[in-house]
Amino acid sequence: MSRECELTGTKPMVGNIVSHSQIKTKRRYLPNLVQVTLRSEALDQNFRMRIAAKALRTVDKLGGLDAFLAKAKEEGLSTKALKIKRDIAKKAVA
């Protein structure tokens, strides 16, 4: 299981801890990932995903998974999220 958000593609970043004496030590900044179940109103299904807490706030702000995926660019999404996005688009056309 990778440490990557399925909706935004947020991954761990690398940086430095800098002490008072300016000694730099490498460290990793991990995304705040949470396991959540999101509901798609268009597909009438629940989806279990591992997403960043920031992405969860954005999903709530935009009004749900369907609205988030409609606005989201495809390059940050996981294969699972891409499939859900395409299924929602097909359902909207039909």
UniProtKB/Swiss-Prot annotation:
Belongs to the bacterial ribosomal protein bL28 family. One of its GO terms (biological process) is translation. Keywords: Ribonucleoprotein, Ribosomal protein. Gene3D superfamilies: Ribosomal protein L28/L24. PANTHER family: 39S RIBOSOMAL PROTEIN L28, MITOCHONDRIAL, LARGE RIBOSOMAL SUBUNIT PROTEIN BL28M. GO terms for molecular function: structural constituent of ribosome. GO terms for cellular component: cytosolic large ribosomal subunit. NCBIfam families: L28. This is Large ribosomal subunit protein bL28. It holds the Pfam family Ribosomal_L28. SUPFAM superfamilies: L28p-like. HAMAP family: Ribosomal_bL28. It comes from Hyphomonas neptunium (strain ATCC 15444). InterPro entries: Ribosomal_bL28, Ribosomal_bL28/bL31-like_sf, Ribosomal_bL28_bact-type, Ribosomal_bL28_sf.
